[in-house]
Amino acid sequence: YASDASSATQTFNARLFDPHTNRYDRGSMTANAMPLAIGLVPEDRRAAVLSNLVADIRAHGNHVTAGDVGFHYVVRALMENDRGDVLFDLLSRTDAPSYGNQLAQGATALTEAWDANPRNSQNHFMLGHAETWLYGGLGGIRIDFDRPAWSRIRIAPQTVAGVDSASARYRSVLGDIATTWLRSGARLRLHVEVPPGATAQIELPTSKASEITESGVGLRRARGILRVSASDSRRVTVVVGSGSYDFEIPDIT
């Protein structure tokens, strides 16, 4: 299967990727977002393809041109590449095409078409992909059963300008997973609940592990902390066992 996957990826890129423009096919949002979301873009081209996707969204006034099939990949591509700021701008629009416009047209459920026109269904879930980011990005709760057991639950909230707090709760097969965060200036407080018998990998937006506290004490002395490491220059990763945790970061990245 690994060999087939590698062969399919190479064929896909050979036929659809333009190395001169760093775009797929005709460069639409869906064309660039889908390969980013499912891992088909060569590692040394990911940043450039992402940049093209973001530029396309900005050029359309923070509107999306993707429909039911493609919007899912746009959300995933931006979320997995830490561009929650772009998603927030996109989801905050009130003119068509947008969720805000659906509300302005009197919708009480998701409509089939972005412009909420009465010719289409007025109760249709096909454009509901934004909740992927609300739970997985803004709330920061993600589960991946392909990962090692200790990191299947990943907590990585994406704080964005314009949002000072958020909370999310997900009833998974492992038990309830919950997060609540509050930002005041550069200070961030994050509450996390990990279900019994599980562990979680928590990514905190700072490069200074020594400044992070959990329930008022440093990470090295806090109960339930199994591992502390620097993911990169912008994150500290903390692995914890089951229980409730209250982190505080005085200066987020």
PLM regions and their residue ranges:
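Catalytic cores of carbohydrate-active enzymes
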Residues: 1-122
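Non-catalytic C-terminal accessory modules of carbohydrate-active enzymes
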Residues: 85-253
